[in-house]
Design a protein with these regions (language model features):
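Class I SAM-dependent methyltransferase core
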Residues: 47
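A short glycine-rich, Lys/Arg-flanked "PGG" loop and its adjoining helix->strand segment in the class I
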Residues: 129-141
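Class I (Rossmann-like) S-adenosyl-L-methionine-dependent methyltransferase catalytic domain
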Residues: 1-43, 51-104, 143-221
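Short catalytic micro-motifs in class I SAM-dependent methyltransferases
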Residues: 118-119
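A conserved beta-strand element that flanks and buttresses the S-adenosyl-L-methionine
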Residues: 115
Length: 221
């Protein structure tokens, strides 16, 4: 099933990690990433928590070389993307992996930019901290990142709401888990906590905002 076929389907979830928004549409963070990449000459980009590759494909189309990584195996979808676009592994490559293992996967490789949409909240806070520290050493220009916010609909009945962020990693109530198609435990963020995490891991926050849905987005360098 190619990207146009996927985008014509209802919102889908793969592996209980929420719906794959990127195969349906671009949001404001996706669009800012694409505009940023258009000014570059074949930038090397990481797409972390790529899902079925909606944004990965768009980034290749504007000239980027993309390495997409997701814990769910989207190898078949990415093989189709490569065939449909007549792209090589250098243009678009997919790896199935848990992001906690990213340092082992990438070793000393460097990338120009990285995108991590709707993904960081699936890691406990200490692992999120470690990942962002590693990315600061690996990404030479900008990080475009979003998380599910405490003020989102997901956070309304979130049982970890009053826990310190270091211990805030819990599953949603069964009804909410089914509604949002999120079966994995999550660490939801308040805006000030998200900003603090980015800064303490070495990132300069150029812009940060809360979406109409209560999710948090940032552009960092």
């Amino acid at each position: 099933m190619n990207l146009s076929d996927l985008s014509s389907q209802p919102y889908q979830s793969f592996g209980g990690f929420g719906v794959d928004v990127a195969i349906k549409r671009t949001d404001d963070l996706d669009k800012r990433m694409l505009e940023h990449l258009k000014s570059k000459n074949k930038p090397k980009v990481l797409d972390l928590g790529s899902g079925a590759g909606g944004q990965s494909v768009r980034m290749v189309e504007v000239g980027a070389s993309v390495l997409a990584i997701d814990i769910y195996d989207f190898s078949e979808e990415f093989t189709e993307h490569q065939m449909n676009g007549n792209w090589s592994q250098d243009d678009l490559m997919f790896v199935t992996a848990d992001l906690v293992n990213l340092p082992k996967i990438l070793s000393d490789k460097k990338f120009d930019d990285a995108l991590m949409q709707r993904t960081l909240h699936y890691l406990p806070y200490d692992q999120a901290d470690d990942l962002l520290v590693f990315l600061r050493k690996t990404v030479e220009d900008k990080l475009f990142i979003s998380v599910t916010g405490m003020d989102s609909a997901v956070g309304e009945n979130y049982s970890g709401k009053n826990l310190p962020i270091a211990n805030r990693f819990v599953r949603l109530e069964p009804a909410e888990a089914d509604i949002f198609q999120i079966q994995a435990p999550v660490c939801l963020y308040k805006k000030e906590e998200f900003i603090a995490l980015l800064k303490q891991t070495g990132w300069e926050v150029e812009d940060v905002w809360q979406s109409a849905f209560g999710n948090l987005k940032a552009v960092c360098k």
